[in-house]
A protein has these predicted regions:
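Membrane-embedded catalytic cores of phosphoryl/pyrophosphoryl-handling enzymes
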Residues: 94-183
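N-terminal transmembrane-helix/juxtamembrane module of multi-pass inner/ER membrane proteins
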Residues: 1-37, 72-99, 176, 180-183
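Hydrophobic core of alpha-helical transmembrane segments in multi-pass integral membrane proteins
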Residues: 35-45, 66, 70
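Alpha-helical transmembrane segments
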Residues: 29-36, 57, 61, 107, ...
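Short, hydrophobic transmembrane alpha-helix segments
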Residues: 22-25, 46-51
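Membrane-interface loops
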Residues: 53-119, 177
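Membrane-water interface at transmembrane helix exits
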Residues: 13, 43-47, 72-80, 118, ...
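Membrane-helix interface segments
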Residues: 19-21, 52-56, 121-128
């Protein structure tokens, strides 16, 4: 299985370094696309200040984001996988944090946000954010800081976090109403 992961990672990372335009676009995705996704959710929160269902959706996305990153921190304590560029496998186009590679925090966070919107029946925006999450995950492999399996692992963590929050934090419960009105 490692050989397949390695081959897929090398294939995607092998596309880097051939066009500065493409490299710059992908580097932007790898570094900044997650912030754009967060900004979109926050803008919906403020735009629909008096519409509680949209605010609830934004709250679920935020809680899913936090849960996914917390789960990644725990997994990171248990699974120590060197980043592919640190292992000499890929060439990195960006600097990265000095933590372990698996699972991808960017992937977990972006898929948590996109999946939360999907589970809250905000399908149109969710589809756009799933496309953004896939682009973000692929860009992290392209720039050489993650294996493909790191991104897939992060996507599973994000999806699971969003599912758990969506199922346990319903729109009609008292806690949800209080939190939405509080902020």
């Amino acid at each position: 299985m490692y050989e397949l992961d390695k081959a897929a990672t090398l294939l995607i990372n092998g596309w880097s370094g051939h066009s500065s335009l493409i490299d710059n676009i992908v580097v932007w995705c790898a570094n900044d696309l997650l912030f754009l996704m967060i900004a979109l959710v926050l803008m919906r929160w403020w735009k629909f200040l008096n519409y509680l269902p949209i605010r609830h959706t934004a709250l679920v996305a935020g809680l899913s984001f936090i849960l996914a990153l917390a789960a990644n921190m725990v997994i990171g304590l248990l699974v120590h996988r060197m980043r592919p560029n640190d292992a000499g496998l890929t060439h990195a186009l960006i600097a990265h944090s000095p933590d372990w590679s698996f699972p991808s925090d960017h992937s977990a966070a972006s898929f948590a946000i996109a999946s939360a919107l999907w589970f809250q029946h905000r399908k149109k925006l969710a589809v756009a954010l799933v496309v953004a999450a896939v682009a973000l995950g692929a860009s992290r492999v392209f720039v050489g800081v993650h294996y493909v399996s790191d991104v897939l692992g992060g996507a599973i963590v994000g999806l699971t976090a969003a599912y758990g929050v969506s199922k346990s934090f319903k729109e009609n419960n008292n806690l949800s109403r209080r939190l939405v009105r509080l902020f």
